[in-house]
Structure formats: C-alpha cells, structure tokens
Amino acid sequence: MGPPSSSGFYVSRAVALLLAGLVAALLLALAVLAALYGHCERVPPSELPGLRDLEAESSPPLRQKPTPTPKPSSARELAVTTTPSNWRPPGPWDQLRLPPWLVPLHYDLELWPQLRPDELPAGSLPFTGRVNITVRCTVATSRLLLHSLFQDCERAEVRGPLSPGTGNATVGRVPVDDVWFALDTEYMVLELSEPLKPGSSYELQLSFSGLVKEDLREGLFLNVYTDQGERRALLASQLEPTFARYVFPCFDEPALKATFNITMIHHPSYVALSNMPKLGQSEKEDVNGSKWTVTTFSTTPHMPTYLVAFVICDYDHVNRTERGKEIRIWARKDAIANGSADFALNITGPIFSFLEDLFNISYSLPKTDIIALPSFDNHAMENWGLMIFDESGLLLEPKDQLTEKKTLISYVVSHEIGHQWFGNLVTMNWWNNIWLNEGFASYFEFEVINYFNPKLPRNEIFFSNILHNILREDHALVTRAVAMKVENFKTSEIQELFDIFTYSKGASMARMLSCFLNEHLFVSALKSYLKTFSYSNAEQDDLWRHFQMAIDDQSTVILPATIKNIMDSWTHQSGFPVITLNVSTGVMKQEPFYLENIKNRTLLTSNDTWIVPILWIKNGTTQPLVWLDQSSKVFPEMQVSDSDHDWVILNLNMTGYYRVNYDKLGWKKLNQQLEKDPKAIPVIHRLQLIDDAFSLSKNNYIEIETALELTKYLAEEDEIIVWHTVLVNLVTRDLVSEVNIYDIYSLLKRYLLKRLNLIWNIYSTIIRENVLALQDDYLALISLEKLFVTACWLGLEDCLQLSKELFAKWVDHPENEIPYPIKDVVLCYGIALGSDKEWDILLNTYTNTTNKEEKIQLAYAMSCSKDPWILNRYMEYAISTSPFTSNETNIIEVVASSEVGRYVAKDFLVNNWQAVSKRYGTQSLINLIYTIGRTVTTDLQIVELQQFFSNMLEEHQRIRVHANLQTIKNENLKNKKLSARIAAWLRRNT
C-alpha cells in the first residue's frame, strides 16, 4: 500500500461504484419528475393567448401597464411574480371541478371598459378591472384555485384572516409567491407562502385586464349598430354558462353563490346597467385628464356568477311600475320613438304578477331592466334584474302584425321571467340538472300565455312549438337523457347541454307531471320546493322529494310508485316509448322507439321500460287514468266491439311523452270515425293520429298505407294546423325532389286537390278580403306557408292566380305589403311565372334594402326563375358584383336547390369553381355536391359526380364526399321504394 497523499479525498472502488449508482438513480428520478411536471401546460399570466393582442393595442388610459418586479417584502404591496417555465405538476388544477377548499361569500367588482362614443371600436377594445373576493376557508391550503380565462393578472393579494365582526379589517396578509394559469381547465392558481386556516375568512384582491370582442357573444362583448342615422356601439355581457371567468376571476360554478357589489366606470354620455338599481355616481379622471363616470349599484342577493350582468349603452327606455317595482324596457332610440318596445312593456308587469301569485313568492329584486340588443346570439338571457334580449325577441314593429312575432315575444318574455324563480331564486346544483331551469321555464311559457289568452288552443300550440320537434329528434341509443348522471363536464360539453332535450323534453316532462297529478298538487309541490331552496341550490331529487311530500299529504291521487321512480324512468333514460294497444284483446305493451325500428337489441340495457301514465278517451269520453308500469299489461276496458261507434285513443291531449300505435283493428276504427264524423275526434287528436301514424310508418312500426288511410277524410278538415301536419309529413322535400323521376306527382295532385278546396277557400278568402283577421291566429300564421306553397306546387289555379295578384300589387305599389306568412311563396312564384323584368325588380329591391331578413327572402326568390340564362346571370352576379359580396347567403347553393337550377349550377361550376371557392369557401363546394347529388340512386351516378368534382377537392375531401354520397344513395333508394308504395296506394284511391 503506498503512502497517503498530503491532500485530497479518496474513496474505495466499491464506494465509487455505489456513488455512481446513486447518481444514476437520482438522474432517473429527475427524469421521471420532469415527465410528471410536464403533464400539463403551466402558463404565466404574461403568456396567455390573446393578451399579446391586448399589449399591442393602446394601453388603457387609466394607468400604465405595470412591469413585473422582484418579489417584495411583506411590508410592500405585492406585485405578482411568475414562474418562467410552462410546466406544472399533476394536481387539483387537472380536475374539471373546483376543489372545495374555499367558499366565496362576496365580490366587490369594478370594471372599466374603454368604450367612447367618439372612438368606435374596430373589433375589440381593452378593459381593466379589480375584484375583491371574500372567501371562507374550509380546508387548510396554500394553493388557491379560481376560474379565469383571457385575462392578464396584474396584481394579487390575499388579506386575512379577517377579524369577525369588523368588516374588512384584517390582522395580516398572506404572501403570494406565484400566480399562474392552467389554460385547459381555465384556472388561475395562486401559490401562497403559508396555508390558509380552516374556518377563517380571507379577501382575495386581484387586478386584471382583458379584451372586449365584437365577434363573440361571450363574456363582455360589443354591438356596433346604426341608430338615428349614426353608427354607435354598446357593451353587454353573456356569462352563462361559464363565461364569467372571461370577465373577472371568480368561482364560476352555479352552486357557489355569493353577493356582489358592482361598479362600472364608463363614458359620461353612456348609461350603465347591472343587476341591481343604481346606488350612486361620481366622477373620475384618467391619466390623460379625460372624465369618466363611476356608477355603483346596490348589493345583489346571493346568486351564481353566471347571472351577473352588465350593459353600457346610449339607449332610451320606456317604463312602468308593477306592484311598486319599476320595469324598464331599453332599446335603440329609433325603436323607442317608434313604439316598438310598448308591447313588451305592457305584458311584462302582468306576467310578473301572475307568477308571483301562482307561487306565492314575490319577485326578489326592487327593479327589472330588459334590454334589446341589435345582435345577441343567445336570443334572450334571464340575468337577475337585467334581462338581455335580441331585438327580434322583444321589439314589435307595425310591420310585424301579420307575423307570429307577437305570440313569440310573449313566449320568450314569459320564459325569461319564469327563470326569475326557476334558475335565479332556486338554481340547479350543477349543469347536469340544467333542465330544472330551462325545462320548467319553458313549460311555464305556455301556462302564462294560456292564462292571458284562454282562447288560444294550448294543446295544439304545445304540439307545434315543442312536441312535434322533440319527438322527431329523441331516439333511444342515439340521444341523451334530460338529466345526466355524469357531473364532470368540460366547458364545451356544458354549452352543448343547452339543446332541444333540455328545453323541449324538459318542458314535456313538466307538462306530463302536471297532467297525471293535477294542477293544484303540481303547483303546491313547486311552491314548497321554491320556498325551501330560495337563494340556494337544488338537485333533481330535491324536486322529487317535494312532489312526494305533496302527494303524501293527500289521498285523491294514487300513484303506482314513488314520484322519484316514476320520473327517473323518464329523465334518466334517453328516447321515449311507443305504446301499442291491441283493441281486440286489451293488451298494451311498451318498447323503446327506435329509428327504423331496428331489430338489433344488443345495445339495450335491462332498464328499458318507463312508468307510463295513460290518459285516454273512448268514444269521445275521457276515461280514468291508468298506468303501464311494466313491459306489457292487459286493460279489458280498452277492448272495442264491432260497433262502428266504438273507438279508443290513448294519450289524452298528447300530455304523455310517447307515440301511440294500435293493432289493425284499432287504426281501422279510428279511420272509420274520421270519415264518418271527424269533429267527434278533438283537433289535438286528429293532429296526433296523423303525426304518430306517419312517424310510425317511417320507422317501420306500421305500413305507410295505414298512415295514408287516415288522410281520406281531409275534404272535411277545416283546421289549418291539422293540414299543416299532414303536408309536413306527406309532401316532404325528398318527395318534391323526386317528382320528375317517379310518377307520383300527378297522382298526388289529383288526390290532394280534391281535398284542399275547403281549407283553401277559407284562407284564400281571408287573404283577399280581410287579411288582418289573421294577426291573432297563431296557428294560421305558422301554417299558412306550407298550405300555400303546396297548393301552388300542385298547380292549384287559384293559388297561382293569387300569387300573381299579390306580386303585381306589390310591384306597382310597394306599400301594398305581401302578407308575411306567404311572402316567400308569392315572391318565388312571382319570379317563376314572370320574366327578366320581374327578376330585375327584385334585384333592385335587394340592392336598396338594408333589412337582413328581406335580403334573405329576395335572394331565395330570385333563384326560383325557370330560365337558365337568368340563373346563370344570377350566379355571375353572386361571385362578382357588389350587391352580393357582403351577403352570407350562398347564392350558388340556393340556385342548385331548385329543380332547374340543379343542372345550371353544375354547369356553372365547371368554369367558375375557383371563383366560387374563393367567394364561399371549399366547404361550399362539398355542400353543392350534396345538393346537386341529392337524387343519386346508383354507384355510377356517384362516380360521375365525383369525377365531375375531382379537380376541385383534396384527397381527404373526396373520401368523405364519397362516403356521404353513398349514404344519400341509400336514403334515395329507400325513398324510391316508399314513393312507389305511395304511388300504388294513390292509384287505388284516386
């Protein structure tokens, strides 16, 4: 062994190997940690998307944008520091729901949008804001999560714990080490140097900035519009469902209710509105010396973030007082001067009073503002105390007297006022139960309007507005349930819940529940529910519990199961049942309603039955309620005899959410009754029989001939809504497009024209002699167009003549307005029966009008020409001349949709496809292929069509187009077989 060295540190070879192993293990661990920390993106505030745009624009004049500073001592005001890297470890920020560590109690919110009347924004404008959020800590944590998106956090402090009973006095401050954003889950994360204490309250103080956009109606947004001949701008908000986080950092979940003190800073020439009445105003100068108005508002009740609302505008208003509370309708100055807001003002107060009396709960806020925006994608929003509408859903102009608009405005206003109880006062706990808001608000639309207009046919209107559409959309296996059991929704999935199932199926559930109980019991349960959960949140089971309490307190209504078991069978299952009654045996069965009555049941769950209330009539007399609470059951009382007067109809007034089928004898008995005395069957059931029969035949439950038999009596039918249902089901777009391929047109013409005389004479006489008589006939207003277009398509001479008369009067004297319900048809046939002279008149009208709706009407009408050269010229104009360059209507698609235009458009595309693609985009070419190819029935036709378009599409587009054309071909082959059967039946019965 050699001598030891005089200096240094030595290890043995074994120790060296051990240390090398430890270093390797450490490096491996670091690699694993790096992979984990890179699990999701971590973004400091300065790198948020969209905020570079903000920095590129002129900074808000109120103060300079602060520059990041080093972490200060606790004695200095904290400026936010950020972690420079974009990684983050796995943690609560990966979850779709906020952790339950903090409960918000109160927000002090100030917003300062830089909107000036002398500098109209070009697409966007900056805003700044401050929010102080008082929270209660429930779990010790040094990481605070709240929602925030599209904002730059400029300052963050946490003060507390707050001393009990001393307001905002604090005993300390919790240093904030870092602020960063989890973009995918839309969180702002505050990293603290020490944990918050459970049971204590704190105040989060945040300053932020962002952008107000014009092109998106989410968060804060802009409308630029024209009023009194000048271009103006306004700012408004839409925070439902998850857009509050776009405006200010917050706890953006519906169950996290809090109170709000709101302050808006705005130009002195504007008025600021929010949920509560104005509390006071003061003046403020920015760094440039410009004066701004500071408007503060009273404290709100406890409410979720999605109901917070702001508007800054230069509007006028009309007002009235209802039970001591002010109601104001705000709109453009022109609209107020024209009286367009008067109708909404006159109905709003009485609707509030009706619902207050019905629920025995007064409206909670001291005022209501309702504002009409020139452009609002959501149509209407129920913000507490500040409801926001699109103009089309609130303003009634003199020219609207012959539209269904008056009734539709009544429904929309009733819906939003209904939300003041269902949604605002009592809010669903989470978005999976949004139907508790929207379904009941939709249902009470009809109850309100029926109360004020008892002569309106309530069942027929509910069918037309709600049932007809939802029953066509809701099919087992391919749709969703009304109430979702899943709670962890992504933001995009939450937005998708605002669909026909939430609104229309939800309303149908409420209506069915009301009918199998009774109105008194139904309202009594709702009163209890609303009172118990006022200013709070509820789940579906809470609602069922209060219904069960009401049922248990009486003995008149006896149910076969608990209300929860009954209603869960409807709200937790997709689709609906088809109920089939054998009138010979009295056997009733249920099965899920499937598209095309699929035979493969392998995807079914064991729970594929409903507890079905059966209200029914026999020989015109209402019978006691029965229940089908299993797959099959015998009801001897529903058997019919051989008597011609013996018949049964299930689903009284269509209050149950299901289709009804009968055995052959049952359908035969109903058909005999229709031919003998149709008025013995109520209008709603004539509607029901037609709609159910055609839907059942389309989906292979019964033969098409069974449905057609029900139309034989139509010569005696004088209810236009029944005719509308027949024509919608029989004269479909597919059938119209096939008239030159199959010999069905001449047969259908002879069959229907023999039966149209009565209904046609009624309404053609009204149109000629007293068209204003239609203004309060809602069912006629929504049905006339289909009657008129079918009569003219069938070549009814008087229809063509009336179209000529109305068109000529309008051309000669434009003040002679064409009745709105048939304006599209009259314009179309005016062009189809005319020459280039009439076409040029429409072009001139199109060029000079600024009304968007009228432009769309005229664009479609000009495509009705039968002259190929006119259609070619039209398409040339569409891609090259100024009248059409700003119009979003795809003129080429419109032309291609017509019988003559299909071939003209195909040839036009050969020479102009690049210009068409540039004007309308590549997707328009794909849409055109489907439009032009909607009659293909062979693979050869598909190949020919694809070869024709091959140079216009990319390879991936060709593959998609081929697959979709195959689907179209299969549909057309099915329609061809159906048309052949219809034609054969018509031959036997014409």
Swiss-Prot record:
Substrate binds at residues 240, 379-383. The active site is at 416 (proton acceptor), 503 (proton donor). GO terms for biological process: peptide catabolic process; proteolysis. Binds 1 zinc ion per subunit. Residues 2-13 are cytoplasmic. The record marks 503 as: Transition state stabilizer. Specifically expressed in placenta and not in other tissues. Mainly found at the cell surface region of the extravillous trophoblasts. Detected on extravillous trophoblasts in the outer layer of the chorion laeve in the fetal membrane Not detected on either fetal amnionic epithelial cells or maternal decidual cells. Also detected in the migrating extravillous trophoblasts in the maternal decidual tissues (at protein level). N-glycosylated. Residues 35-990 are lumenal. Keywords: Glycoprotein, Hydrolase, Membrane, Metal-binding, Metalloprotease, Protease, Signal-anchor, Transmembrane, Transmembrane helix, Zinc. Its cofactor is Zn(2+). PANTHER family: AMINOPEPTIDASE Q (PTHR11533:SF31), PROTEASE M1 ZINC METALLOPROTEASE (PTHR11533). This is Aminopeptidase Q.
